[in-house]
From Swiss-Prot:
It is found in: Cytoplasm. The gene is hcp. Keywords: 2Fe-2S, Cytoplasm, Iron, Iron-sulfur, Metal-binding, Oxidoreductase. One of its GO terms (biological process) is response to hydrogen peroxide. PANTHER family: HYDROXYLAMINE REDUCTASE (PTHR30109:SF0). Belongs to the HCP family. Hybrid [4Fe-2O-2S] cluster binds at H252, E276, C320, C408, C436, C461, E495, K497. This is Hydroxylamine reductase.
Amino acid sequence: MVCIQCEQTVQTPTAKGCSYTQGMCGKTADVSDLQDVLVFNLQGVSFWAELGRKYNIIDAEIDAWAPRAFFSTLTNVNFVPERITEYTEIAERYKIQLSTQVMAAAAAAGEALPELSPAAQFVLPATAEEIMNFAPEAAVNRGHEELHEDIIGLRLLCLYGLKGAAAYMEHANVLGQSEESICAEYHQIMAFLGTDPTDANALLETSMQIGLLNYRIMEILDRGETNTFGHPQPTQVNVKPVAGKCILVSGHDLHDLEKILQQTEGKGINVYTNGEMLPAHGYPELNKYPHLVGNFGSAWQNQQKEFANFPGAIVMTSNCLINPNVGQYADRLFTRSIVGWPGVVHIEGDDFSQVIECALAQEGIAHTEIEHMITVGFGRNALMAAAPAVINEVKAGNIKHFFLIGGCDGDKEERSYFTDIAVSAPEDSVILTLACGKYRFNKKEFGDINGIPRLLDVGQCNDTYSAIQLVLALAEEFDCGVNELPLSIVLSWFEQKAIVVLLTLFALGIKGIYTGPTAPAFLTDNLIKALQENFDMRSVGDVETDLATMLAGK
């Protein structure tokens, strides 16, 4: 087992990354090794998918499936070895299908095949034992004995960035959004990584390519969400319990939430969002359901306590899932799509009757607590509609600084930095926030500036796209570059979606971003220095010192 993809991975003076029997996330060594074999086989699929395009061999089914399977290896998604093995076997079938078609097309054209990558040549062993024996050859740090650590680090930066982009591709695909050019570029990058590249410049260029690709993916995901559910509108959300039978929906999948709302109409069941599902309340086509009564709980790392205290059924639609046996609620938990935990019921299709039956069988919430309302729904349209008023306040000198504070949350004490920055921001500043990092401060009162709320909840992590649109509009209005705006970006990271968002910001030329609470363990000192030199990437430090630097525009 070698896994170094998330912020909580083991870091000691002598070693970096989870190894031995279990990762910090709870996945076993066997699951980790199986994920490595799956990713390796997916690189082989992409080799043939990319080459196939030369002969007009394009399979939409494979284009949709490949990033979905890749998503299953993201942190806190799937812990079931049988499911990972099944994905690997499907990848093998697709690889054989594509390679057979491509070789026939090349032969018909009288053309020789290019050199095959190791992943393209790989033949999946027939037995589980043989697959596990092969796993070290598919390890994410393969070749580390001979290669400079910077090359391994760059490979991982690209691999983990592309994994985050693949997750957003799947979210978009669920909503009917896909573009052939995006799929083609995904396969091209995945195939390149399957060649075990050693050119540092090529890898750096690829990391920026991934960032720009993800910008396009976030754009079509935004289109899918707004076309399906309407444009988010500023909406108040109750964060206190309401008496009654109940279902909690966590993850990121708005489609699943809609299906649950439709199937629970008239059944006396209240539906709550959790984690990254909080922004759902801002979408008109979801908020129209009166039994979507509020948000329960906070960020993913608190779920073992919060889910244990939730007296109803729980649906995990995507990341982030952690061990449900700790809080003894596995019998009330249901997984969807690429998510899985051993022994937990997994739901295929759109029939949530098992969830409904479970909810009705539970005690439900006994008492309604006094409401506590927070505001969400400052998506792209809402932000752009507010832009003229914001610009007027800037010109009048009433708004002097903007902060974008958000990203993935986690349980390290150092993450209090993000709370402290938000509450310490001067009253003539506006804070944009997104992703589950917002839970650090989104229940606090920030007031407003002449009717403009000082705290604007932009949405999920992928809604970075919306924040970028506002930033670009401000830069155009004030005839300056983004980096000349009175804007400070402070991002907390935990997993691969945050990595690709960071690559997107870098690829768009945005500099001076503060990141933390720690640097990714897969980045070497040399790579961190390179990111600092090229993008002015900054590590979070002392709140007072950092805030003074931000406000001074340095």
